[in-house]
From Swiss-Prot:
Tissue localization of expression: In leaves, flowers and fruits. Observed in all floral whorls at early developmental stages, but restricted to carpel before anthesis.
Organism listed in the record: Antirrhinum majus (Garden snapdragon)
Transit peptide start and end: 1-78
Taxonomy of the source species: Eukaryota, Viridiplantae, Streptophyta, Embryophyta, Tracheophyta
Gene behind the chain: WAXY
Upregulation: Expressed with a circadian rhythm with peak expression at the end of the day.
Main location: plastid
Pfam family, one: Glyco_transf_5
Record field: compositional bias (Polar residues): 1-10
Residues reported to bind ADP-alpha-D-glucose: K96
Pathway this chain belongs to: Glycan biosynthesis; starch biosynthesis
Span list, region Disordered: 1-24, 588-608
Protein name: Granule-bound starch synthase 1, chloroplastic/amyloplastic
């Protein structure tokens, strides 16, 4: 629990794990005095709002059907749609290091377009120009100290974007966040990450109760307590634990549920066992965190594992593709030692969509020639020449160009690709690699120009315009991932008529069909310490196969097949809706079919 300040009024609610017999008297009461209207119709919550929330909850519960033992079934008729709160460490375009930021940039607007009320809660890593101070403050116990956090807010594409403001987030990052959300550089974590994300989880539980958001013409007032929280990856795995220990034990959020989404099982939040005391959770949760592995990082021996706790304490576990869901329970190799834990709870796989407004060849501002499925064959050669010129390769529209865009780390297989280039670079082909990540991998791709001056280029920079140029101008997109929960690069590529050449893992299996929309290389060895020569050969062999098809009738049909697909969030959002409705949260109903409430707006991401 937390202390809540709205305008200049503070009322205290004591945190802790034990329940109180007079819970109602401990609820935060925020009065009418000095109430401020701040921006976009947002104002501080007041006593009238609190009473209205309680009355609505009572009226709703009176309509709930009872089971034989008198407990509520959970479905109440009190409006349309669900109250959804996505909690996450990053959200595009404000903060993004990879697919997680893209997903929560695109899925929430799609859910809003389906008639649901949607909020996202993430850290405020920078002074975002389009997010404004709500003047709502809460005090949260983090470790041994009481920390004060503020909420910033903006309303975009039908979604309440809420940002948790605290120096623990701001002091880590300057300018665009790049890869410094989780650590000072790739592969290194901040030492206080357990405190940073503990604060995020607790603040996220307060946001639906204390923020009186009225920006939408469809919904107004606080979200209240009948909500579905969607926690994402290990950074938010404490949320179901705090929900139970700090709220439900005191009679609050009784009908709320938590869906826990695994975007990447490789990152689990493993800390030393002694760090459990920093989380301010009762001992009854220790078993959910308890974990033992054979590694010496961060400490040798027994540890706590945040993701394990998130899986066990949530009401539903979901991941980002059906095939990845099967891989996670297939054994310790793909499940990264949590396969047995996931098997106990079951898991649902829902393939990701993509942002078809940002990634649209017909309107893309980063390419010189816009096109659609009817003009792609005319536009591609022109865009290829522009791409070749931009990176300094010989300009020739007849040479097949292969692209790679991604993080330079073991998961994405950039080291396997670099090792394979020598095996096919003698063919009539050029290759362009764009990415940032581990320094040794950045150095590898930067050396390509020296090794193959007329054949290859490596750009170790964060370069959005070039990413769009490669996606549009390349003929093939290589995705050599050792494992890939879902993947967005192959979706972007197909949207632009660029044929994927991909490993057969995770969401790549679900989204790319061999011989119809792409070429599969087979599954790779997930051992990251070395490059498996067999995987190098798989890349070389499949590239040769793709180059042999280049320019053929079958190749042109594959381009058409790629571009004819609906890769938007519309279908995945409906699958998410079905899954979340099955949790039976009070007030939940199917949303009203429609489109996104607002078109893509120009986002002012960060101050210069």
């Amino acid at each position: 629990m937390a202390t809540v300040t709205a305008s200049q009024l503070v009322s205290h609610v004591h945190g802790g794990a034990t329940s109180s017999p007079d819970t109602k008297t401990n609820l935060a009461q925020v009065g009418l005095r000095n109430q401020q209207f701040t921006h976009n119709g947002l104002r501080s919550i007041n006593m009238v709002d609190k009473l209205q929330m309680r009355n609505n909850a009572k009226q709703s519960r009176s309509l709930v059907k009872k089971t034989d033992n008198g407990s509520p079934l959970g479905k109440i008729i009190c409006g349309t749609g669900m109250n959804l709160v996505f909690v996450l460490a990053e959200v595009g375009p404000w903060s993004k290091t990879g697919g997680l930021g893209d997903v929560v940039g695109g899925l929430p607007p799609a859910m809003a377009g389906n008639g649901h009320r949607v909020m996202t809660v993430s850290p405020r890593y920078d002074q975002y120009k389009d997010a404004w101070d709500t003047s709502v403050v809460v005090e949260i116990k983090v470790g041994d100290s009481i920390e004060t956090v503020r909420f910033f807010h903006c309303y975009k594409r039908g979604v309440d974007r809420v940002f948790v403001d605290h120096p623990i987030f701001l002091e880590k990052v300057w300018g665009k966040t790049k890869s410094k959300i989780y650590g000072p550089n790739a592969g290194t974590d901040y030492q206080d990450n357990q405190l940073r994300f503990s604060l995020l989880c607790q603040a996220a539980l307060e946001a639906p109760r204390v923020l009186n958001l009225t920006s939408s013409k469809y919904f107004s007032g606080p979200y209240g307590e009948d909500v579905v929280f969607v926690a994402n990856d290990w950074h938010t795995a404490l949320l179901p634990c705090y929900l139970k220990s700090m709220y439900q034990s005191k009679g609050m959020y009784l009908h709320a549920k938590v869906a826990f989404c695994i975007h990447n099982i490789a990152y689990q939040g493993r800390f030393g066992s002694s760090d459990f005391c920093l989380l301010n959770l009762p001992d009854q949760f220790k078993s959910s965190f308890d974990f033992f592995d054979g590694y010496e990082k961060p400490v040798k021996g027994r540890k706590i594992n945040w993701m394990k706790a998130g899986i066990l304490e949530s009401d539903r576990v979901v991941t980002v593709s059906p095939y990845y869901a099967m891989e996670l329970v297939s054994g310790a190799e793909k499940g990264v030692e949590l396969d047995n834990v996931i098997a106990k709870t079951s898991i649902t796989g829902i393939v990701n969509g993509m942002d078809t407004q940002e990634w649209n060849p017909a309107t893309d501002k980063h390419i010189d020639t816009n096109y659609d499925i009817t003009t792609v064959m005319d536009a591609k050669p022109l865009l290829k020449e522009a791409l070749q010129a931009a990176v300094g390769l010989p300009v020739d529209k007849n040479i097949p160009v292969i692209g790679f865009i991604g993080r330079l780390e073991e998961q994405k297989g950039s080291d396997i690709l670099v090792a394979a280039i020598s095996k096919f670079v003698g063919l009539d082909v050029q290759i362009i690699i764009l990415g940032t990540g581990k320094k040794k991998f950045e150095q590898q791709i930067q050396e390509l120009e020296v090794l193959y001056p007329d054949k290859a280029r490596g750009v170790a920079k964060f370069n959005v315009p070039l990413a769009h140029m490669i996606t549009a101008g390349a003929d093939f997109m290589l995705v050599p991932s050792r494992f890939e929960p879902c993947g967005l690069i192959q979706l972007h590529a197909m949207r632009y008529g660029t044929i994927p050449i991909c490993a057969s893992t995770g969401g790549l299996v679900d989204t790319v069909t061999e011989g119809f929309t792409g070429f599969h290389m087979g599954a790779f060895n997930v051992e990251c310490a070395t490059v498996d020569p067999a995987d190098v050969q798989k890349i070389a062999t499949t590239v040769e196969r793709a180059l042999a098809a280049y320019g053929s009738v079958a190749y042109k049909e594959m381009i058409q097949n790629c571009m004819a697909q609906d890769l938007s969030w519309k279908g995945p959002a409906k699958n998410w809706e079905k899954m979340l409705l099955s949790l039976g949260v009070s007030g939940s109903e199917p949303g009203v079919d429609g489109e996104e409430i607002a078109p893509l707006a120009k986002e002012n991401v960060a101050t210069p």
